[in-house]
A protein has these predicted regions:
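Active-site segment of metal-dependent pyrophosphate-handling enzymes
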Residues: 13-17, 59-63, 67-110, 115, ...
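Short conserved catalytic/interaction loops centered on acidic-Pro-aromatic/His motifs
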Residues: 175-189, 198-201
Length: 232
Protein backbone atom coordinates (compact mmCIF):
# COMPACT_ATOMS: atom_id res chain seq x y z
CA UNK A 1 0.00 0.00 0.00
CA UNK A 2 1.27 3.46 -0.94
CA UNK A 3 1.86 5.99 1.82
CA UNK A 4 1.03 9.06 -0.27
CA UNK A 5 -1.78 9.92 2.16
CA UNK A 6 0.90 10.58 4.80
CA UNK A 7 2.44 13.41 2.76
CA UNK A 8 1.35 16.86 4.02
CA UNK A 9 -0.63 18.94 1.52
CA UNK A 10 2.00 21.69 1.52
CA UNK A 11 4.77 19.27 0.43
CA UNK A 12 5.91 17.82 -2.88
CA UNK A 13 5.15 14.13 -3.23
CA UNK A 14 8.21 13.08 -5.25
CA UNK A 15 11.05 15.11 -3.71
CA UNK A 16 12.46 14.56 -0.24
CA UNK A 17 15.52 15.42 1.82
CA UNK A 18 17.41 12.99 4.03
CA UNK A 19 19.58 14.52 6.73
CA UNK A 20 22.58 12.53 7.94
CA UNK A 21 23.13 13.89 11.45
CA UNK A 22 26.56 13.07 12.90
CA UNK A 23 28.10 13.59 16.35
CA UNK A 24 31.19 12.40 18.21
CA UNK A 25 30.61 10.33 21.36
CA UNK A 26 33.52 9.01 23.43
CA UNK A 27 35.81 8.98 20.41
CA UNK A 28 33.28 7.31 18.12
CA UNK A 29 31.51 8.83 15.12
CA UNK A 30 27.77 8.31 15.47
CA UNK A 31 24.74 8.96 13.29
CA UNK A 32 21.18 9.64 14.39
CA UNK A 33 18.62 7.19 12.98
CA UNK A 34 14.89 6.81 13.36
CA UNK A 35 12.58 3.80 13.47
CA UNK A 36 9.41 4.78 11.63
CA UNK A 37 5.91 3.89 12.79
CA UNK A 38 3.88 4.50 9.61
CA UNK A 39 3.94 3.79 5.89
CA UNK A 40 6.25 1.47 3.97
CA UNK A 41 9.07 2.07 6.47
CA UNK A 42 7.02 1.19 9.56
CA UNK A 43 9.06 -0.75 12.11
CA UNK A 44 12.31 -0.19 10.23
CA UNK A 45 15.35 2.03 10.79
CA UNK A 46 16.31 4.78 8.39
CA UNK A 47 17.72 8.24 7.93
CA UNK A 48 15.79 11.21 9.24
CA UNK A 49 14.08 12.93 6.36
CA UNK A 50 11.01 14.76 5.18
CA UNK A 51 9.26 15.98 2.08
CA UNK A 52 10.25 19.34 0.60
CA UNK A 53 7.56 21.99 0.91
CA UNK A 54 6.35 23.74 -2.23
CA UNK A 55 7.53 27.14 -0.97
CA UNK A 56 10.80 25.90 0.56
CA UNK A 57 14.39 25.74 -0.69
CA UNK A 58 15.87 22.24 -0.56
CA UNK A 59 18.63 23.30 1.85
CA UNK A 60 16.03 24.98 4.06
CA UNK A 61 14.17 21.67 4.20
CA UNK A 62 17.34 19.85 5.27
CA UNK A 63 18.00 22.50 7.94
CA UNK A 64 14.42 22.17 9.17
CA UNK A 65 14.79 18.41 9.58
CA UNK A 66 17.97 18.76 11.64
CA UNK A 67 16.72 21.66 13.74
CA UNK A 68 13.35 20.12 14.60
CA UNK A 69 14.98 16.79 15.43
CA UNK A 70 17.95 17.94 17.52
CA UNK A 71 16.95 21.39 18.74
CA UNK A 72 20.31 22.72 17.50
CA UNK A 73 20.18 25.99 15.56
CA UNK A 74 23.80 26.54 14.54
CA UNK A 75 25.57 23.61 12.88
CA UNK A 76 27.59 22.65 9.82
CA UNK A 77 25.26 21.63 6.97
CA UNK A 78 26.41 20.60 3.52
CA UNK A 79 24.85 18.85 0.55
CA UNK A 80 26.13 15.36 -0.16
CA UNK A 81 24.34 14.35 -3.36
CA UNK A 82 21.00 13.61 -4.98
CA UNK A 83 19.90 9.98 -5.07
CA UNK A 84 17.44 9.12 -7.81
CA UNK A 85 17.78 5.48 -8.77
CA UNK A 86 14.54 4.55 -10.49
CA UNK A 87 14.03 1.62 -8.11
CA UNK A 88 15.10 3.27 -4.85
CA UNK A 89 11.49 3.50 -3.66
CA UNK A 90 9.37 0.38 -4.21
CA UNK A 91 6.08 1.95 -5.33
CA UNK A 92 6.67 5.24 -7.11
CA UNK A 93 9.43 7.54 -8.28
CA UNK A 94 10.98 9.62 -5.50
CA UNK A 95 14.22 11.58 -5.62
CA UNK A 96 15.95 12.48 -2.39
CA UNK A 97 18.68 15.05 -1.77
CA UNK A 98 21.00 14.03 1.05
CA UNK A 99 22.64 16.56 3.38
CA UNK A 100 25.01 15.91 6.25
CA UNK A 101 24.92 17.86 9.49
CA UNK A 102 27.70 17.93 12.09
CA UNK A 103 26.50 18.67 15.62
CA UNK A 104 27.91 18.64 19.14
CA UNK A 105 26.27 15.83 21.06
CA UNK A 106 26.05 17.84 24.26
CA UNK A 107 24.01 20.54 22.50
CA UNK A 108 21.32 18.20 21.20
CA UNK A 109 17.87 17.75 22.69
CA UNK A 110 16.37 14.97 20.62
CA UNK A 111 12.74 15.49 19.62
CA UNK A 112 10.70 12.56 18.34
CA UNK A 113 8.58 13.35 15.28
CA UNK A 114 5.04 12.25 14.45
CA UNK A 115 6.12 9.30 12.27
CA UNK A 116 8.72 8.17 14.79
CA UNK A 117 8.56 5.02 16.89
CA UNK A 118 12.13 5.33 18.19
CA UNK A 119 15.16 7.55 17.62
CA UNK A 120 18.72 6.57 18.53
CA UNK A 121 22.41 7.30 17.96
CA UNK A 122 24.33 4.48 16.25
CA UNK A 123 28.05 3.94 15.75
CA UNK A 124 28.62 4.35 12.00
CA UNK A 125 30.48 1.01 12.02
CA UNK A 126 27.62 -0.86 13.66
CA UNK A 127 24.41 0.09 11.89
CA UNK A 128 21.09 -1.77 11.91
CA UNK A 129 19.41 -2.94 8.72
CA UNK A 130 18.17 0.17 6.91
CA UNK A 131 15.30 0.98 4.57
CA UNK A 132 15.54 1.61 0.84
CA UNK A 133 18.99 2.91 -0.23
CA UNK A 134 19.86 4.53 3.09
CA UNK A 135 22.86 2.27 3.70
CA UNK A 136 24.30 3.34 0.34
CA UNK A 137 23.72 6.99 1.20
CA UNK A 138 25.56 6.65 4.51
CA UNK A 139 28.46 4.78 2.92
CA UNK A 140 28.71 7.48 0.26
CA UNK A 141 28.89 10.13 2.97
CA UNK A 142 31.58 8.29 4.94
CA UNK A 143 33.71 8.03 1.80
CA UNK A 144 33.14 11.73 1.20
CA UNK A 145 34.40 12.47 4.71
CA UNK A 146 37.69 10.70 4.04
CA UNK A 147 38.50 13.26 1.37
CA UNK A 148 36.81 16.28 2.90
CA UNK A 149 38.45 16.08 6.33
CA UNK A 150 41.91 16.07 4.71
CA UNK A 151 41.27 19.31 2.84
CA UNK A 152 38.79 21.31 4.93
CA UNK A 153 38.35 21.66 8.70
CA UNK A 154 34.75 20.40 8.57
CA UNK A 155 35.16 17.85 11.34
CA UNK A 156 35.97 20.50 13.91
CA UNK A 157 32.26 21.29 14.10
CA UNK A 158 31.90 18.00 16.00
CA UNK A 159 34.21 19.01 18.84
CA UNK A 160 33.33 20.98 21.97
CA UNK A 161 34.50 24.59 22.18
CA UNK A 162 37.47 23.46 24.30
CA UNK A 163 38.99 20.08 23.55
CA UNK A 164 42.08 17.96 24.06
CA UNK A 165 44.56 16.88 21.41
CA UNK A 166 43.38 13.31 21.98
CA UNK A 167 39.82 14.30 21.13
CA UNK A 168 41.06 15.97 17.96
CA UNK A 169 43.05 12.88 16.99
CA UNK A 170 40.06 10.62 17.69
CA UNK A 171 38.00 12.81 15.38
CA UNK A 172 40.44 12.38 12.51
CA UNK A 173 40.76 8.66 13.16
CA UNK A 174 36.98 8.23 13.15
CA UNK A 175 36.46 10.13 9.91
CA UNK A 176 39.46 8.62 8.12
CA UNK A 177 38.99 5.09 9.53
CA UNK A 178 42.67 4.82 10.40
CA UNK A 179 44.92 4.73 13.46
CA UNK A 180 47.24 7.72 13.48
CA UNK A 181 50.70 7.98 15.01
CA UNK A 182 50.35 10.33 17.98
CA UNK A 183 53.62 12.34 17.65
CA UNK A 184 53.28 12.63 13.88
CA UNK A 185 49.65 13.76 14.13
CA UNK A 186 50.43 16.45 16.68
CA UNK A 187 53.36 17.69 14.62
CA UNK A 188 51.12 18.11 11.56
CA UNK A 189 48.41 19.87 13.55
CA UNK A 190 50.91 22.27 15.12
CA UNK A 191 52.20 23.23 11.66
CA UNK A 192 48.70 24.43 10.76
CA UNK A 193 48.86 27.09 13.53
CA UNK A 194 45.19 26.43 14.09
CA UNK A 195 45.12 25.78 17.83
CA UNK A 196 45.25 28.16 20.77
CA UNK A 197 46.30 26.82 24.16
CA UNK A 198 43.54 27.68 26.66
CA UNK A 199 46.01 27.38 29.55
CA UNK A 200 43.48 25.09 31.20
CA UNK A 201 43.32 21.41 32.10
CA UNK A 202 40.49 18.91 31.98
CA UNK A 203 38.40 18.70 35.13
CA UNK A 204 36.69 15.76 36.77
CA UNK A 205 38.62 13.04 34.94
CA UNK A 206 40.03 9.88 36.53
CA UNK A 207 43.19 9.96 34.44
CA UNK A 208 45.88 12.63 34.21
CA UNK A 209 44.20 15.86 33.12
CA UNK A 210 45.13 16.91 29.58
CA UNK A 211 45.55 20.46 28.29
CA UNK A 212 42.60 22.10 26.59
CA UNK A 213 42.74 23.91 23.26
CA UNK A 214 40.41 25.93 21.08
CA UNK A 215 40.49 26.91 17.44
CA UNK A 216 41.90 30.21 16.21
CA UNK A 217 38.78 31.41 14.41
CA UNK A 218 40.71 33.56 11.92
CA UNK A 219 42.94 30.67 10.84
CA UNK A 220 39.91 28.38 10.87
CA UNK A 221 37.99 30.61 8.44
CA UNK A 222 41.01 30.87 6.12
CA UNK A 223 41.36 27.10 6.06
CA UNK A 224 37.66 26.77 5.27
CA UNK A 225 38.01 29.21 2.40
CA UNK A 226 41.31 28.08 0.89
CA UNK A 227 41.60 24.51 2.16
CA UNK A 228 44.71 22.58 3.18
CA UNK A 229 46.26 19.16 2.74
CA UNK A 230 46.41 16.77 5.68
CA UNK A 231 48.37 13.68 4.65
CA UNK A 232 48.89 10.78 7.02
Amino acid sequence: MDDAELIPKDCMSNLSVDSLIFAMDEGRLKILLVKYNQGLAAGKWGLIGHWVKWDEDIESAAYRVVNTTTGVKDFHLDQLSAFGNVNRYPIRRIVTVAYYALVRLEETQIIRGENTHEIQWFDVRNLPELIFDHKDIIESCLEHFKYKVRHEPIGFSLLPEKFTLLQLQELYEAMLEVTLDKPNFRRKINKMNLLIDCKEKQKGVAHRAASLYRFDINVYEKLREFGFSFEY
